[in-house]
Amino acid sequence: MSRIEEITKELVMPILEENNFELVDVEYKKEGKHWYLRVYIDKEGGITLDDCQLVSEYLSDRLDEVDPIDHSYILEVSSPGLDRPLKTPRDFKRNLGKEVEVSLYQPIDKRKKFTGELLEFTGDKIILLCEGEKREFEMKNVRLVKPVIKF
C-alpha cells in the first residue's frame, strides 16, 4: 500500500467505524492523465448512495486538512460491487458456503483456476469443495478469489 493509500485509510477509519462500515480497499493510481483516489466501502445489507456521499464529504474535508497529495486528483467513494475479489478475512467469512473462483500464481495439477464451494478460511489457507473433492490452497499461491455470480 502506498503512503497516500495508508494516510487515506487512517483518515477514513473514524467515519467508517462510527457507521459500522467496512473498508474494503483504497486505490491511488493514475489512469490516462488523471490521478484517482478510490475508496471502496461496504456494510451488512449493502452500501447506499447516501453512505458514499457521507464518507466522501468527510474524507474530502480530512484530506484538505492534511493535504497529502500535491497535485489534483479525483476522489471516488463507492461500493466494491458484487463480483469484487475477496480480500479481507470478513470477505472470506461472509462467503463461506458460497461458490467462488480461485486463481493461482503457480498451477496445481496443471490448472491455475478452480471453482467450488468455499468451506474454510484460516488466514493462510482456504479449502474448497471442487467437483465433490476437498482442495486446499495456500494463500501465498492464491492470486485472486472472486465470488461466482449466477443470474
From Swiss-Prot:
Cytoplasm keyword on record: yes
GO CC entries: cytosol
Cystine bridges: none
InterPro entries assigned: Ribosome_maturation_RimP, RimP_C, RimP_C_sf, RimP_N, RimP_N_sf
Gene Ontology BP, a term: translation
Domain of life, source organism: Bacteria
Keywords on record: Cytoplasm, Ribosome biogenesis
Keyword Ribonucleoprotein recorded: no
Function of the protein: Required for maturation of 30S ribosomal subunits.
PANTHER family: RIBOSOME MATURATION FACTOR RIMP
Protein name: Ribosome maturation factor RimP
Species per Swiss-Prot/TrEMBL record: Caldanaerobacter subterraneus subsp. tengcongensis (strain DSM 15242 / JCM 11007 / NBRC 100824 / MB4) (Thermoanaerobacter tengcongensis)
